[in-house]
Amino acid sequence: MSLAPEGRRLLRVEARNAEVPVERKPEWIKAKVHMGPEYIGLKNKVKSAGLHTVCEEAGCPNIFECWEDREATFLIGGDICTRRCDFCDITSGKPRPLDMEEPQKVAENIREMDLRYATVTGVARDDQKDGAAWLYAETIRRIHALNPGTGVEILPPDFGAVPELVQQVFDARPEVFAHNLETVPRIFKRIRPAFTYEKSLRVLTMAKADGLVTKSNLILGMGEEDHEIDQALVDLHESGCDIITITQYVRPSKLHHPIDRWVKPQEFVQWSQRAEEIGFQGVMAGPLVRSSYRAGKLYAQAMQRLGRTLPENLAHLAGEKTARQEASAVVAQMS
């Protein structure tokens, strides 16, 4: 009998995945390290204060660039998800009780780090009657109260697309409401069995109708075809999605979905151009782009294109900022 690293019996899908060897990464997937003074100062502060971010704990390759601009990502709701997606490295199972003090703790972490923009994501909590909607909403409220100069991007699960649950999060007024579609209809059930393509789009439509700036992500390299990517982009835009990030799937372990292909940087440039043509207000595509990468920059760009003025307390997010992982920049580095 095959066992997972934590000692449990392998799921059938994991056993099937494990039959495919882990793929070797191409040269363009390897990130170059650029450690500036802001990054070094922030890292020292995080270490001395015992703070926790997804950026460090997930080993994100973009931490140097994001921290240099004082942006970071936090995970709430615990570290065990009630759903299992075939690309995701978060453990699935029965989670521990919610930490009701977590919203305040996250807000205090952000204050200690003096962040300009924070992305807050989290696990699905289907064990909770409200899907932990209160936790997401309260975290937004506490961050805003304690850090008026920090933009907040919330990246929750779909809450089953139940209007009264998602409305709790909308009412907390994050700067950006993000929900990641991730893949195309044909392989959606295999990749995200506890979600549906339609509900993910519906959540974005509801957020847009409530006046929020909306955002989503597509992961390439999991078996999708070009025409399916194009249709997913159209579907997202028609559902009210303002900002799109397009990324390369990188397999966390042999138990996860095998990589179908490594998408070349030049192709990401083409998808970025296509997303602009479709009408997205903010686009970021590249092999090492992640959904929270340069999130403050994309929010400011979308606000400008939507004809909205940045709030005075967030005016510092405007202006040109680097994006070393953006596809055209990667292509330029390769030449």
Swiss-Prot record:
Annotated Radical SAM core domain residues: 67-281
UniProt KW keywords: 4Fe-4S, Cytoplasm, Iron, Iron-sulfur, Metal-binding, S-adenosyl-L-methionine, Transferase
Entry's localization field: Cytoplasm
List of residues binding [4Fe-4S] cluster 1: C55, C60, C66, S292
Enzyme Commission number(s): 2.8.1.8
Top-level EC class as recorded in UniProt: transferase
GO molecular function: 4 iron, 4 sulfur cluster binding; lipoate synthase activity; metal ion binding
Residue ranges of coiled coil: none
Pfam families the record matches: LIAS_N, Radical_SAM
Binding site for [4Fe-4S] cluster 2: C81, C85, C88
Entries under InterPro entries matching the protein: Aldolase_TIM, Elp3/MiaA/NifB-like_rSAM, LIAS_N, Lipoyl_synth, rSAM
GO cellular component, one term: cytoplasm
Biological or metabolic pathway of the protein: Protein modification; protein lipoylation via endogenous pathway; protein N(6)-(lipoyl)lysine from octanoyl-[acyl-carrier-protein]: step 2/2
Catalysed reactions, as listed in the record: [[Fe-S] cluster scaffold protein carrying a second [4Fe-4S](2+) cluster] + N(6)-octanoyl-L-lysyl-[protein] + 2 oxidized [2Fe-2S]-[ferredoxin] + 2 S-adenosyl-L-methionine + 4 H(+) = [[Fe-S] cluster scaffold protein] + N(6)-[(R)-dihydrolipoyl]-L-lysyl-[protein] + 4 Fe(3+) + 2 hydrogen sulfide + 2 5'-deoxyadenosine + 2 L-methionine + 2 reduced [2Fe-2S]-[ferredoxin]
Cofactor: [4Fe-4S] cluster
Broad class of where this protein is predominantly found: cytoplasm
Cofactor, how bound (note): Binds 2 [4Fe-4S] clusters per subunit. One cluster is coordinated with 3 cysteines and an exchangeable S-adenosyl-L-methionine.
Similarity field: Belongs to the radical SAM superfamily. Lipoyl synthase family.
Alphabetical list of NCBIfam families matching this protein: lipA, PRK05481.1, PRK12928.1
Protein name per its UniProtKB record: Lipoyl synthase
Organism name: Micrococcus luteus (strain ATCC 4698 / DSM 20030 / JCM 1464 / CCM 169 / CCUG 5858 / IAM 1056 / NBRC 3333 / NCIMB 9278 / NCTC 2665 / VKM Ac-2230) (Micrococcus lysodeikticus)
